[in-house]
Amino acid sequence: MGKKQTFASDTSQRSITDWIRALLVLLLGLIIAHLGVTLFLLSALGTDTFTVFIQGLSRVAGLSVGTVHVIVLCMLMVLMLLTTKGYVKPGTIVCAFCGGPIIDFFTWCFKEYINASSGMPVRIISVLVGCAILSLGMSVVINSNAGTGPNDLVAIILSDKLERIEFRWIRMGCDAFFVSLGFILGGTVGVGTIIAIFLTGPMVQFWLPKTKVLLQKIRV
């Protein structure tokens, strides 16, 4: 078996112009992805594993999901800056501060049209469309090569440290931890969570080559 790939990298040689271009693409991906997250949340049928954790914390703290999202990601980012090297990039900072407000904005836009009182067909469609949009946005973020969110870095850092364990098992362990803690705190676990667990990965894999080609065509 060959040496397992690690994820830390040095991007210090990038020009300012390249960073601006990459960060704009990442921001576009964040907007798309968090629209998907919002559709999951509004369906009240469960959401992705990390958002279950954030939702549970928000109910305990009495704060919006977006506000708690920013607080938790900033805490994770500071911890990573203090204990690791090469993982936190400019895009990580953008993810930490922008994701929460985007969720709150889309929640404000759509909460009157999609909610727990909506018909079940509307809520199920919201989950399915949300999963497709979330995975599309994630593929754009990945192809931006500008960094990723602190929540995703948890599994990445652990994978690099625990060299004998495959990344997928570490990711599944992190997902199980977040969803279990979120459920204990009052987050909604439901059919949407199951859909997110089993469909998000394959759909991201479906979108990755397509968004890569598109971004190459527009020279991003």
Question: Positions of the model-derived regions?
Answer:
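Core subunits and conserved enzymes of cellular information-processing
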Residues: 2-220
